[in-house]
A protein has these predicted regions:
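Flexible, solvent-exposed loop segments that connect beta-strands
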Residues: 38-46, 75-100, 126-141, 166-180
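Outer-membrane beta-barrel channels and translocator barrels
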Residues: 21-23, 62, 113-115, 151-154, ...
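Glycine- and aromatic-enriched membrane insertion/assembly motifs of diderm outer-membrane
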Residues: 27, 45-90
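Short, structured interface segments that constitute the first stable element of a domain
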Residues: 87-120
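Residues on the lipid-exposed face of transmembrane beta-strands in outer-membrane beta-barrel proteins
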Residues: 30-36, 53-59, 63, 71-73, ...
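Bacterial Sec-dependent N-terminal signal peptides
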Residues: 1-31, 184, 188-190
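Short connector loops at helix/strand junctions that flank enzyme active sites
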Residues: 48-52, 62-66, 99-103, 113-117, ...
């Protein structure tokens, strides 16, 4: 965590940094991509790849800084090995658990060179499909950290969503979401 703050401080002190859009402007960005998702604190699980998509609005505060907020549909979860889990019972190798979330990323974006932004924020999320897991929490909270690059309004975004809240309502499990998300979007000036 200390390294992350140090990296952010170094990026903030960069000279000659500027954004793609005029100060005071708003943009709207539809985004589509993939999640590479798993959970912490569960043995014999593997990452799974699934869909992510949504919409993000951004306000350009200065040449160096913008704020954004969005609504993302995110299929997360994990693949399993042969194991008996207290949450879902006995599962076979290769089975997947695939809850769907509506996440609300609220991000601070620091532009270090034209088009390149370092991102840090908060992300509340709400489960919209539990995939038949009765002991699953319906609220999730994570810290997204990432980078994006914009060229001619096309934006490539890569971020890691570090889950802070337990996803199961089971005392024996302290599992949290761990999601790497890659999306491609297009910024429309408003």
């Amino acid at each position: 965590m200390k390294k992350l703050f140090l990296l952010a401080a170094v990026m903030l002190s960069s000279v000659g940094a500027f954004a793609q859009h005029a100060v005071g402007s708003f943009t709207l960005q539809p985004r589509l991509g993939i999640n590479i998702a798993t959970v912490t604190d569960l043995d014999r699980t593997k990452s799974r790849v699934d869909f992510a998509g949504g919409l993000e609005a951004e306000y350009q505060v200065s040449d160096l800084f913008s704020l954004s907020g969005g609504l993302m549909y995110s299929r997360q979860g994990f693949k399993m090995e042969d194991v008996n889990l207290p949450v879902v019972g006995t599962v076979k190798k290769g089975d997947s658990w695939t809850p769907s979330y509506l996440n609300i990323p609220i991000m601070a974006n620091v532009y270090v060179v034209k088009g390149l932004a370092v991102k840090l924020g908060i992300q509340p999320g709400f489960v919209v499909d539990k995939d038949d897991a009765d002991h699953m929490e319906t609220f999730d909270f994570s810290i997204p950290v990432g980078l994006s690059y914009e060229y001619q309004n096309v934006v490539f975004d890569a971020r890691y969503n570090w889950g802070l809240t337990k996803i199961y309502d089971v005392d024996k499990l302290d599992s949290k979401n761990s999601v790497f998300q890659i999306t491609l979007g297009y910024k429309f000036d408003l």
